[in-house]
Regions:
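Short secondary-structure capping/junction motifs at helix and strand boundaries
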Residues: 2-5, 27-35, 60-62, 138
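Short, composition-biased local secondary-structure segments
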Residues: 12-25, 39, 92-103
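Short glycine-enriched loops at secondary-structure junctions
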Residues: 9, 37-41, 87
Length: 168
């Protein structure tokens, strides 16, 4: 049974603020185009999209569309940043290659934010995804039942930074 994640309006606002700050520390800027490719059901992804919007980035709610459709979205909207899981980032890159698309050359993704499973903080895994995509990979960590994204990696990639002002 999935975990329900009830949040107050204040919790949600704090979370959106934290996402915007964390995205900034990971290099996302207002001129970026961000695609969120995780579902919005009981995974609480809404604040991630709203955090990118608060920062000024164009935000695309891609959800869990088929991989071929997501690749088309990445090309059509010239997406520069994507949020997904580490395993799906790898799978999507491999799918692109099978479709004759070189993620490094043909897509223009510069940042991949990963969460939801181990991998993003494992240097070897992160480096393999970065090599496949030609993009920087940043790990995010969260617990749906306390605050969603509780920590994230900055451009130094030397660990995760806690949302200390929101986690008590």
């Amino acid at each position: 049974m999935p975990t329900a994640s009830p949040f107050s309006a204040t919790d949600f606002d704090d979370w959106i603020d934290y996402e915007a700050r964390q995205f900034w520390s990971s290099g996302l800027r207002p001129e970026d185009r961000y695609a969120h490719s995780l579902n919005f059901s009981l995974f609480v992804g809404g604040p991630c999209v709203l955090g990118a919007q608060k920062l000024g980035a164009l935000s695309i709610h891609a959800g869990t569309v088929p991989s071929e459709r997501l690749l088309a979205i990445l090309r059509q909207f010239k997406v520069t940043a994507i949020w997904t899981t580490p395993s799906y980032a790898w799978y999507l890159g491999e799918t692109a290659l099978k479709e004759g698309i070189d993620p490094r050359r043909d897509l223009g993704v510069q940042r991949i934010f990963v969460a939801g499973e181990p991998g993003g903080s494992i240097a070897e895994t992160r480096q393999r995804i970065e090599a496949l995509w030609g993009a920087d990979v940043y790990d995010y960590y969260g617990l749906s039942d306390i605050f969603g994204s509780c920590a994230g990696m900055c451009t130094e990639k030397d660990g995760l930074h806690w949302a200390e002002d929101h986690i008590h």
